[in-house]
Amino acid sequence: RDSSTSRGLGDVYKRQGYAPVENPEIRIGRNTKDFGNGFYCTIIKEQAQRWAKRYDTKIVSIYDVRLNSALQIKEFKEMTDEWLDFIIDCRSGKKHAYDIVIGAMADDQIYNYVSDYMDGSITREQFWVLAKFKYPTHQINFCTKEALKCLEYRGFEEVL
């Protein structure tokens, strides 16, 4: 291992179907994402499996991660106003300077509340009342090519 790695996250899972992803790459899509463009994974295996079940071929790719302390890493340890503002900025198309962003995911239901807040339909306080998760969520976005070097492909599992 490279001496510049500071901490490992252990296994992370790519929440997608179709086929294993041995060589991760930054995806730039039409739709804006919580933490901007990048390669999204999670440390919660069950979450990745739930996402994979949306596809005909239900595949979860598995990686080992060693974070490089030289990279710009932003971690949201909990859902806070800063987390919400960051998601709103990213979903609005604003760029950020981080290589890796880690934190809770605004799933479909939560994103509806984010949209309502952005539209002024609900207040920030109302957002937080509505934003209680049924189960915890987690995401890591590898935003740059340098960040992708922290990932080592270990294999995949088919979700039944």
Annotate each PLM feature.
Residues 1-13:
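Single conserved hydrophobic/aromatic residue that forms the stacking wall/gate
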Residues 11-33:
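Short aromatic-glycine-(Arg/Gly/Cys) micro-motifs in beta-strand/loop hairpins
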Residues 13-14, 35, 39-40, 63:
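Aromatic side chains
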Residues 30-53:
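Extended catalytic/binding region for NAD+/ADP-ribose chemistry, centered on the ART fold
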Residues 7, 21-23, 34, 54-160:
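Conserved NAD+-utilizing ADP-ribose enzyme module
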